[in-house]
């Protein structure tokens, strides 16, 4: 799925940048393995620890305290902040709960991921649940994000 997504971006002369929390660079890694990586991958930033979200990406304490680091609201803000760091066409931010120890609740169990795709003047928000081992969850979220990028680019 990554290669299909990267090919679509390359065919449309679009670049992508990633801001990754729970995926910790996995999305950037997957794109770097594509034959089209040199044409599409601008780079990425891992903000696994909340201090990076605050100090590097300027996400406010208030937003994090109100919604938690793993939330739709913080993920959307990561897309906004990524536009100040990267000159890309597509911006992807992902937060979530890969394993226990984050902000999981009954309503937001481990396996919940939030991702946002910024394209042109729009931001598209997604909330998904992935099951399995951490590795299986990473593979699932990568596939889901690639499919969403394809849908966003094709339908915009």
Regions found by a protein language model. Give the residues of each.
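Short alpha-helical segments enriched in small residues
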Residues: 1-156
């Amino acid at each position: 799925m990554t290669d299909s997504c990267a090919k679509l971006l390359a065919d449309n002369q679009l670049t992508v940048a990633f801001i990754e929390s729970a995926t910790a660079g996995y999305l950037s890694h997957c794109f770097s393995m594509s034959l089209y990586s040199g044409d599409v991958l601008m780079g990425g930033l891992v903000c696994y620890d909340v201090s990076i979200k605050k100090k590097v990406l300027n996400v406010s304490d208030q937003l994090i305290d109100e919604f938690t680091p793993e939330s739709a609201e913080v993920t959307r803000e990561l897309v906004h902040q990524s536009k100040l760091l990267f000159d890309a066409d597509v911006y992807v931010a992902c937060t979530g709960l890969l394993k226990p120890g984050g902000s999981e609740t009954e309503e937001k169990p481990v396996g919940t991921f939030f991702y946002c795709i910024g394209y042109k003047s729009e931001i598209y928000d997604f909330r998904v649940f992935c099951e399995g081992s951490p590795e299986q969850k990473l593979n699932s979220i990568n596939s889901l994000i690639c499919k969403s990028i394809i849908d966003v680019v094709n339908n915009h």
